[in-house]
Amino acid sequence: MYQNFVTKHDTAIQTSRFSVTGNVIPAAPTGNIPVINGGSITAERAVVNLYANMNVSTSSDGSFIVAMKVDTSPTDPNCVISAGVNLSFAGTSYPIVGIVRFESASEQPTSIAGSEVEHYPIEMSVGSGGVCSARDCATVDIHPRTSGNNVFVGVICSSAKWTSGRVIGTIATTQVIHEYQVLQPLK
C-alpha cells in the first residue's frame, strides 16, 4: 500500500517578488472585491510585500485579494496552490484569510465580483492586535471553465470590522505542478 503526501507551503527561491504600496479599500463580499497586484504577476510563484494604508469607514466590513495568474499548461486540471501569509493590521482588525480562485477575461483585473470567487479555507492563526499568519495549501482547478478566460489564484483577506491604518506583511503563493510524492509503505 502506498501513501500520497502533499507538502505544505515552501516558498521557492526563484520568485516574482515585488512590493505593493498605496491604499487598500476593502469591499463588501456582495460587491466588487479589489484585486491587488503589481501589474506583472504572471509567474507560477509570487511573493508580495504589502505595505499599504487601509482606508475604511468605522467598523467597515469587506475583503481584498492579492492574486497571481496561474500556468494553465499542465494537462492535469487539478493543481496544488500553496500559500504563506504573515500580515499585521492596524487597530482591531481581525482578518480571516483563505485561498481563492477566479476567472477573468482581463490580463490584470483590478476587481472581481464576490459571487464569482471560489473560496478554499486554510489553516490560520490570529494573534492579538490584528496579526495573522497562515501556511497551507489547496487543490484548485487551474483550467478555465469559460474559453478565453485567464485563471487567477490568490489570498483573500476578509474582516467584519476593518480599522483604518497600516497593513504590513508578506503573502507568498506557489503553484505546485507536481503536487504529491508517493511514499514507500512502512515495514
From Swiss-Prot:
It comes from the Viruses. Gene3D superfamilies: 2.60.120.20. One of its GO terms (biological process) is symbiont entry into host cell. InterPro entries: Capsid/spike_ssDNA_virus, Spike_G, Viral_coat. The keyword Heme does not apply. Keywords: Capsid protein, Host-virus interaction, Viral attachment to host cell, Viral genome ejection through host cell envelope, Viral penetration into host cytoplasm, Virion, Virus entry into host cell. GO terms for cellular component: viral capsid. It is found in: Virion. Belongs to the microvirus G protein family. The virion is composed of 60 copies each of the F, G, and J proteins, and 12 copies of the H protein. There are 12 spikes which are each composed of 5 G and one H proteins. Attaches the circulating virion to the bacterial lipopolysaccharides which serve as receptor for the virus. Determines the phage host-range. Probably triggers with protein H the injection of the phage DNA into the host cytoplasm upon conformational changes induced by the interaction with host lipopolysaccharides. This is Major spike protein G. It comes from Escherichia phage alpha3. The lineage of its organism: Viruses, Monodnaviria, Sangervirae, Phixviricota, Malgrandaviricetes.
